A protein has these predicted regions:
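Helix-loop-helix hairpin linking two adjacent transmembrane segments in secondary transporters
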Residues: 143-190
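Conserved MFS/SLC helix-loop-helix module at the cytosolic interface between two early adjacent transmembrane helices
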Residues: 64-103
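Extracellular/periplasmic helix-loop-helix junction of adjacent transmembrane segments
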Residues: 30-64
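MFS-fold secondary transporters
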Residues: 92-96, 112, 185
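Helix-breaking motifs and short loop linkers at transmembrane-helix boundaries and internal kinks
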Residues: 39, 77, 98-104, 132, ...
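Extracytoplasmic
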Residues: 8-40
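Cytoplasmic helix-loop-helix junction between adjacent transmembrane helices
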Residues: 108-148
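Residue-level signature of mid-helix packing/kink "hotspots" within the transmembrane helices
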Residues: 25, 59-67, 117, 151-152
Length: 191
Protein backbone atom coordinates (compact mmCIF):
# COMPACT_ATOMS: atom_id res chain seq x y z
CA UNK A 1 0.00 0.00 0.00
CA UNK A 2 1.28 3.44 -0.97
CA UNK A 3 2.20 5.62 2.00
CA UNK A 4 0.05 8.74 2.28
CA UNK A 5 -2.36 7.38 -0.32
CA UNK A 6 -5.07 9.93 0.40
CA UNK A 7 -2.64 12.75 -0.42
CA UNK A 8 -1.82 11.07 -3.71
CA UNK A 9 -5.55 10.86 -4.40
CA UNK A 10 -6.21 14.54 -3.71
CA UNK A 11 -3.08 15.47 -5.67
CA UNK A 12 -4.30 13.53 -8.68
CA UNK A 13 -7.76 15.07 -8.36
CA UNK A 14 -6.13 18.53 -8.31
CA UNK A 15 -4.12 17.66 -11.43
CA UNK A 16 -7.36 16.49 -13.06
CA UNK A 17 -8.79 19.95 -12.36
CA UNK A 18 -5.77 21.56 -14.05
CA UNK A 19 -6.32 19.38 -17.12
CA UNK A 20 -10.06 20.11 -16.97
CA UNK A 21 -9.43 23.83 -17.26
CA UNK A 22 -6.84 23.49 -20.01
CA UNK A 23 -9.23 21.37 -22.08
CA UNK A 24 -12.12 23.74 -21.39
CA UNK A 25 -10.19 26.92 -22.21
CA UNK A 26 -8.59 25.56 -25.39
CA UNK A 27 -11.70 26.35 -27.44
CA UNK A 28 -11.75 30.02 -26.46
CA UNK A 29 -8.02 30.41 -26.94
CA UNK A 30 -8.11 28.78 -30.36
CA UNK A 31 -11.41 30.26 -31.57
CA UNK A 32 -9.89 33.05 -33.73
CA UNK A 33 -7.96 30.47 -35.78
CA UNK A 34 -10.92 28.08 -35.89
CA UNK A 35 -13.28 30.84 -37.03
CA UNK A 36 -10.95 31.97 -39.83
CA UNK A 37 -10.53 28.43 -41.11
CA UNK A 38 -14.05 27.06 -40.79
CA UNK A 39 -16.12 30.21 -41.30
CA UNK A 40 -14.10 32.43 -43.67
CA UNK A 41 -17.21 33.91 -45.29
CA UNK A 42 -18.49 35.34 -42.01
CA UNK A 43 -17.63 38.65 -40.45
CA UNK A 44 -16.60 39.16 -36.82
CA UNK A 45 -20.23 39.40 -35.66
CA UNK A 46 -20.99 36.06 -37.29
CA UNK A 47 -17.98 34.51 -35.59
CA UNK A 48 -19.15 35.89 -32.23
CA UNK A 49 -22.65 34.48 -32.77
CA UNK A 50 -21.32 31.00 -33.54
CA UNK A 51 -18.92 31.15 -30.59
CA UNK A 52 -21.75 32.23 -28.31
CA UNK A 53 -24.00 29.40 -29.50
CA UNK A 54 -21.34 26.74 -29.03
CA UNK A 55 -20.35 28.14 -25.63
CA UNK A 56 -23.96 28.19 -24.45
CA UNK A 57 -24.39 24.56 -25.48
CA UNK A 58 -21.27 23.69 -23.48
CA UNK A 59 -22.54 25.44 -20.34
CA UNK A 60 -26.00 23.87 -20.57
CA UNK A 61 -24.43 20.44 -20.97
CA UNK A 62 -22.06 21.13 -18.11
CA UNK A 63 -24.95 22.10 -15.84
CA UNK A 64 -26.81 18.88 -16.66
CA UNK A 65 -23.64 16.85 -16.30
CA UNK A 66 -23.20 17.91 -12.66
CA UNK A 67 -26.25 15.98 -11.45
CA UNK A 68 -25.69 13.13 -13.89
CA UNK A 69 -22.12 12.54 -12.76
CA UNK A 70 -23.06 13.04 -9.13
CA UNK A 71 -25.35 10.03 -9.53
CA UNK A 72 -22.71 8.10 -11.50
CA UNK A 73 -20.05 8.66 -8.82
CA UNK A 74 -22.50 7.59 -6.09
CA UNK A 75 -23.34 4.48 -8.10
CA UNK A 76 -19.89 3.27 -9.23
CA UNK A 77 -17.44 5.11 -6.97
CA UNK A 78 -14.58 7.50 -7.55
CA UNK A 79 -12.09 5.15 -9.19
CA UNK A 80 -14.29 4.20 -12.14
CA UNK A 81 -16.26 7.46 -12.03
CA UNK A 82 -13.14 9.53 -12.66
CA UNK A 83 -11.96 7.06 -15.31
CA UNK A 84 -15.24 7.51 -17.20
CA UNK A 85 -15.44 11.28 -16.72
CA UNK A 86 -11.84 12.02 -17.68
CA UNK A 87 -11.71 9.37 -20.38
CA UNK A 88 -14.82 10.75 -22.08
CA UNK A 89 -13.81 14.40 -21.73
CA UNK A 90 -10.34 13.64 -23.11
CA UNK A 91 -11.79 11.89 -26.14
CA UNK A 92 -14.32 14.70 -26.59
CA UNK A 93 -11.47 17.22 -26.52
CA UNK A 94 -9.58 15.28 -29.18
CA UNK A 95 -12.73 15.06 -31.31
CA UNK A 96 -12.69 18.86 -31.56
CA UNK A 97 -9.84 18.39 -34.05
CA UNK A 98 -12.32 16.79 -36.44
CA UNK A 99 -15.10 19.38 -36.11
CA UNK A 100 -16.23 20.90 -39.39
CA UNK A 101 -18.79 23.46 -38.30
CA UNK A 102 -21.44 24.54 -35.84
CA UNK A 103 -23.16 21.16 -35.48
CA UNK A 104 -20.04 19.05 -34.92
CA UNK A 105 -18.48 21.60 -32.56
CA UNK A 106 -21.76 21.78 -30.63
CA UNK A 107 -21.88 17.99 -30.28
CA UNK A 108 -18.26 17.72 -29.15
CA UNK A 109 -18.56 20.68 -26.75
CA UNK A 110 -21.74 19.18 -25.31
CA UNK A 111 -20.01 15.86 -24.72
CA UNK A 112 -17.07 17.71 -23.15
CA UNK A 113 -19.39 19.71 -20.89
CA UNK A 114 -21.25 16.66 -19.64
CA UNK A 115 -18.07 14.71 -18.92
CA UNK A 116 -16.04 17.59 -17.44
CA UNK A 117 -18.84 18.24 -14.97
CA UNK A 118 -17.93 14.96 -13.26
CA UNK A 119 -14.76 16.45 -11.85
CA UNK A 120 -16.59 18.40 -9.12
CA UNK A 121 -18.95 15.77 -7.69
CA UNK A 122 -16.08 13.29 -8.03
CA UNK A 123 -13.76 15.53 -6.01
CA UNK A 124 -16.38 15.99 -3.30
CA UNK A 125 -16.91 12.23 -3.08
CA UNK A 126 -13.15 11.52 -3.05
CA UNK A 127 -12.71 13.99 -0.21
CA UNK A 128 -15.49 12.35 1.78
CA UNK A 129 -14.09 8.85 1.17
CA UNK A 130 -10.41 9.56 1.73
CA UNK A 131 -10.29 12.28 4.38
CA UNK A 132 -11.53 12.56 7.95
CA UNK A 133 -13.90 15.44 8.61
CA UNK A 134 -11.16 17.54 10.21
CA UNK A 135 -9.07 17.49 6.96
CA UNK A 136 -11.77 17.75 4.29
CA UNK A 137 -11.56 21.52 3.94
CA UNK A 138 -7.81 21.23 3.31
CA UNK A 139 -8.38 18.48 0.75
CA UNK A 140 -11.06 20.55 -0.99
CA UNK A 141 -8.72 23.54 -0.94
CA UNK A 142 -6.02 21.50 -2.67
CA UNK A 143 -8.49 20.38 -5.32
CA UNK A 144 -9.76 23.95 -5.81
CA UNK A 145 -6.16 25.13 -6.18
CA UNK A 146 -5.90 22.76 -9.12
CA UNK A 147 -8.87 24.45 -10.76
CA UNK A 148 -7.33 27.88 -10.21
CA UNK A 149 -3.94 26.70 -11.50
CA UNK A 150 -5.61 25.28 -14.60
CA UNK A 151 -7.24 28.63 -15.28
CA UNK A 152 -3.88 30.34 -14.86
CA UNK A 153 -1.84 28.04 -17.12
CA UNK A 154 -4.43 27.26 -19.81
CA UNK A 155 -3.88 30.27 -22.06
CA UNK A 156 -0.07 30.31 -21.79
CA UNK A 157 0.06 26.56 -22.53
CA UNK A 158 -2.31 26.88 -25.49
CA UNK A 159 -0.45 29.97 -26.70
CA UNK A 160 2.88 28.17 -26.56
CA UNK A 161 1.49 25.16 -28.39
CA UNK A 162 -0.02 27.42 -31.06
CA UNK A 163 3.46 28.62 -31.98
CA UNK A 164 4.29 25.10 -33.15
CA UNK A 165 0.96 23.47 -34.02
CA UNK A 166 -2.37 24.29 -35.63
CA UNK A 167 -5.60 24.21 -33.62
CA UNK A 168 -6.44 20.63 -34.62
CA UNK A 169 -3.18 19.22 -33.28
CA UNK A 170 -3.53 21.25 -30.09
CA UNK A 171 -6.91 19.66 -29.32
CA UNK A 172 -5.30 16.24 -29.75
CA UNK A 173 -2.34 17.16 -27.52
CA UNK A 174 -4.41 18.59 -24.67
CA UNK A 175 -6.88 15.70 -24.93
CA UNK A 176 -4.03 13.25 -24.46
CA UNK A 177 -3.19 14.86 -21.10
CA UNK A 178 -6.32 13.39 -19.53
CA UNK A 179 -5.64 9.95 -20.94
CA UNK A 180 -2.13 10.09 -19.49
CA UNK A 181 -3.65 11.10 -16.13
CA UNK A 182 -5.63 7.86 -16.14
CA UNK A 183 -2.44 5.78 -15.86
CA UNK A 184 -1.44 6.80 -12.32
CA UNK A 185 -5.09 7.08 -11.26
CA UNK A 186 -5.91 3.49 -12.19
CA UNK A 187 -2.59 2.24 -10.78
CA UNK A 188 -2.73 4.09 -7.44
CA UNK A 189 -6.45 4.12 -6.63
CA UNK A 190 -7.73 0.58 -6.15
CA UNK A 191 -11.13 1.20 -4.55
Amino acid sequence: KLKGLRWWVVGLVAIAAVINYIDRQAFGALWPDIAKELFPEMDEDGHKAIYGTISTIFILSYAGGQALFGKIFDWIGTRIGFAISIGVWSIATMLHAFAQGLLSFSIFRSLLGIAEAGNWPGAAKANAEWFPTKERALAQGIFNSGAAAGGIVAYPVIGLLSIYFDWKVIFIVVGILGLLWLLPWMFIVKS
